[in-house]
Amino acid sequence: DVYKRQDQESAIFEQNELFLDLTTNYEREGLYKSELKDVLNKARLIEEENSTFLLEQKRKFNDHFSKWQELFRSFLTAEIESDCLLPDGNLQDFIVHLEWIALEYTAIKQFLFLDWMQNGSLTYEKIRDTITLVCRMTGYEEDYIYEYMQDCFDDVVWEWGYLAFILT
């Protein structure tokens, strides 16, 4: 179906843009250079890829990625419990932290997708190293998270459809 295909294509490009945006400052500062070099090069080439090829690659990657669901379920549970359930937090804090975790997850998955496109494998070690790297890159104080969200999005609280869109 044409609309589903367009949504899937748009999601791939949006996920890639989010990944590039999250890594911009690190690249500029020369941080994590060796870890990011190859995937950033691939990320910049995504826009030029044939969409049919990209969709097929994403489908194949998701087949491999699904084997790691339990690991990611545990990771996301730990992130939500530690970042969203704050003693003095309010509903907006909860939502913003949940969105930040979604960005973190999207960046991890996009990094792994780009790496998988280059190397054809998805190993526990690569997943572990990627989670560690992205968590370091996104481990900011609350003030910075709010500032980033405000700068990158119209509002710090997204439409729920956008959250679902980037997580596809």
How would you label these PLM feature ranges?
Residues 2-3:
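Short, small-residue-biased leader/transition segments that mark boundaries at the very start
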Residues 12-168:
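Substrate-recognition/cap regions that form aromatic- and gly/pro-loop-enriched pockets
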